C-alpha cells in the first residue's frame, strides 16, 4: 500500500517555508495554535471574494503581524482603508495582542496553485464541464511560464451516480524531487450532486539553497586538505 505525504510538509525547511513563525512554551503553544487556526478561518470567510492565496502569521514580542497574499487587494482594503481597519480589530481581539496586517498582491494568480484550485472549484459550482475547466486553467498556467501543472478532481463528476477521480497534466511535476519548487492548492466545490474536491500541483523550477551549496564547497575544501595531507605524508615516507 502506498503512503501519501503532504507535498508542503515534506518540503518544509528544504524548498518550502512555514506559514506560522513564532516560539512558545508548552503552556502557550496550544493557545497560539488555536488562535492561528481561528484567524485563518475568519479571514478566509470574511474575504472569500478577495482570492486569498496564503496567510502568514508572525508573533514578535507582544505583537503580531499577519501577511495576506491576495489576488484582489482592493476587496481587503475597502474604501479609504475602512474594511482593513475593522478586520485588524477583529483579528486583534482573537489573538489578544496588537496586530498589523500586510496586504500583498499576487501579480499572476494563474501561477498560484491555491488560486487555480479555487478558480476550478468556482467553475464547477457554475456547472461548467470539469474537463473544460481543468484544461483552461492548465493552458493559462503553461502560457504564463509554469514548467508543469497537474489538476485532479474527485467526486460525482457531471452528476454521475458513482464518484470517481479525473486528472489532467501538462509539463513536468517531479514530486520525488525535494528541491523542486512545487506549489500545492486544494479547494472544494459544493454542487447540487455533492462535494467535489480539487487539487492542484504546480512546478516552477528547482530551488538551490545557497547555504547548502556553500556547505558542500566547505566539505569539498576540507576533503581536499585531507587528501593533500595524506599525499604529503606519503611523499615523506618514500623519501
Swiss-Prot record:
Swiss-Prot/TrEMBL keywords: Ribonucleoprotein, Ribosomal protein, RNA-binding, rRNA-binding
A GO molecular function held by the record: mRNA binding
Gene3D superfamilies: 3.30.300.20, Ribosomal protein S3, C-terminal domain (3.30.1140.32)
KH type-2 domain segment(s): 39-107
Origin: domain of life: Bacteria
Disordered, as annotated region: 214-239
GO biological process: translation
UniProt xrefs under InterPro entries: KH_dom, KH_dom-like_a/b, KH_dom_type_2, KH_sf_prok-type, Ribosomal_S3_C_sf, Ribosomal_uS3_bac-typ, Ribosomal_uS3_C
GO cellular component, one term: cytosolic small ribosomal subunit
Key word Secreted present: no
Bias-annotated ranges (Basic and acidic residues): 216-239
Presence of the UniProt keyword rRNA-binding in the record: yes
NCBIfam families with a match to the protein in the record: rpsC_bact (TIGR01009)
HAMAP family xref list: Ribosomal_uS3_B
Entries under PANTHER family matching the protein: 30S/40S RIBOSOMAL PROTEIN S3, SMALL RIBOSOMAL SUBUNIT PROTEIN US3C
Job of this protein: Binds the lower part of the 30S subunit head. Binds mRNA in the 70S ribosome, positioning it for translation.
Subunit-level organization: Part of the 30S ribosomal subunit. Forms a tight complex with proteins S10 and S14.
UniProt record similarity statement: Belongs to the universal ribosomal protein uS3 family.
Protein name: Small ribosomal subunit protein uS3
Amino acid at each position: 500500500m502506498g503512503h501519501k505525504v503532504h507535498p508542503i510538509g515534506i518540503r518544509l525547511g528544504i524548498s518550502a517555508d512555514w506559514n506560522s513563525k513564532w516560539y512558545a512554551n508548552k503552556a502557550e503553544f496550544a493557545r497560539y495554535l488555536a488562535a492561528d487556526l481561528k484567524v485563518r478561518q475568519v479571514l478566509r470567510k470574511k474575504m472569500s471574494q478577495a482570492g486569498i492565496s496564503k496567510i502568514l502569521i508572525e508573533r514578535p514580542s507582544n505583537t503580531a503581524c499577519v501577511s495576506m497574499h491576495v489576488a484582489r487587494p482592493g476587496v481587503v482594503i475597502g474604501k479609504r482603508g475602512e474594511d482593513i481597519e475593522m478586520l485588524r480589530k477583529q483579528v486583534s481581539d482573537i489573538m489578544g495582542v496588537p496586530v498589523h496586517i500586510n496586504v500583498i498582491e499576487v501579480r499572476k494568480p494563474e501561477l498560484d496553485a491555491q488560486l487555480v484550485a479555487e478558480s476550478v472549484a468556482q467553475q464547477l459550482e457554475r456547472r461548467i464541464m470539469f474537463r473544460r475547466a481543468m484544461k483552461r486553467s492548465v493552458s493559462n498556467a503553461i502560457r504564463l511560464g509554469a514548467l508543469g501543472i497537474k489538476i485532479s478532481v474527485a467526486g460525482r463528476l457531471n452528476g454521475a451516480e458513482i464518484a470517481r477521480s479525473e486528472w489532467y497534466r501538462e509539463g513536468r511535476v517531479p514530486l520525488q524531487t525535494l528541491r523542486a519548487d512545487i506549489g500545492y492548492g486544494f479547494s472544494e466545490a459544493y454542487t447540487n450532486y455533492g462535494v467535489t474536491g480539487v487539487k492542484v500541483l504546480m512546478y516552477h523550477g528547482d530551488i538551490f539553497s545557497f547555504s547548502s551549496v556553500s556547505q558542500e564547497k566547505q566539505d569539498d575544501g576540507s576533503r581536499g586538505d585531507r587528501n593533500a595531507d595524506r599525499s604529503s605524508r606519503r611523499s615523506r615516507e618514500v623519501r
